[in-house]
């Protein structure tokens, strides 16, 4: 049973055909408490509604706590069966993203009532109201809501935008929400944020990443109404400087903030960051206005005693000297720092600041391949790995994504890699650019039976999101 618990469900299903003993184990309901029926995710797909209803009754039953359903399986008989046979179901994902037409929900009379988390992947063209109005009475206990838009699937061509779900009605049915994630939804604007703030006074975390219509005009109302709001993520929103400066940040409980790629001015960034009472997590990447003077003034005028995570990716107007002074002063508390995309960040800076960063768990450095010509010097990776090994005993995630023309290593690199592997036993992920050095490091870790640690920057990346207080609740898909 314990061995089977480590296998994906598609392998468990295949193993059921080996013998009667394995079939008995494979059908044990304890192995099916978390199920994805989206074939592109899990490899599992049920081809008939009748078969799924049989599985819910016999295989899943009271053990089921989490389920993902694709569009073709979201029907009222299936949802009725989940409500009746799965009393412990607390997490559900409903994927409408590929839908061209909804099923008929006129006869739907039941829906799981103990849900704590619900994720809905929206379609670009299917209006959800026919389905949503049938479930409003069953979801008032929701604490975590994900509405996932079509940002990653959108074409570059301008298309007509439809408001496919009525957020204003939805917020009235979910007064107990603590975490709301509106990801990449092309119709979401400040009126929708204001709607959630009017009814969800328990809100602790709001993420509107990649919602380009959000300008910040709702920030003042949001911060005044939601006194428990600690985490606000606005990556690539179209924030306006005057709207951001008008919000009363000094009276808020905000501790975690993402303003990546929001094109704020230096004045607005400084005004915002110095008024937050106590910040612990900041992502301010891709901001041309985040300069040496902003970094210096922020350090002198803000309360940074609790700062544990800082992301300055692609803030290429920062100098090595300014970063050295800032990290030297505040680095002792940092658990995660992202400095990739900054040409002045090389092994020499890390060698100077790493003795201060003794609590560091996440470190990201490097340069995107299409920007590698901006590097002002070569990076001696042997010295870098030796420095990290000596001072980063708590290191969990490390990314050194410089290309092979920028990295310099020697025949003695194996010794430095050995030292890094032995002295950083908690290292879960080491991301490198594909090439000769990557092959050397990967082979070294594989010989030590740590085959999943070393990864290429084509398939993996590192960030500070693991340090968010609501990281687990914010995971979707």
Q: What residue ranges belong to the model's regions?
A:
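The conserved beta-strand core of Leucine-Rich Repeat
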Residues: 1-477
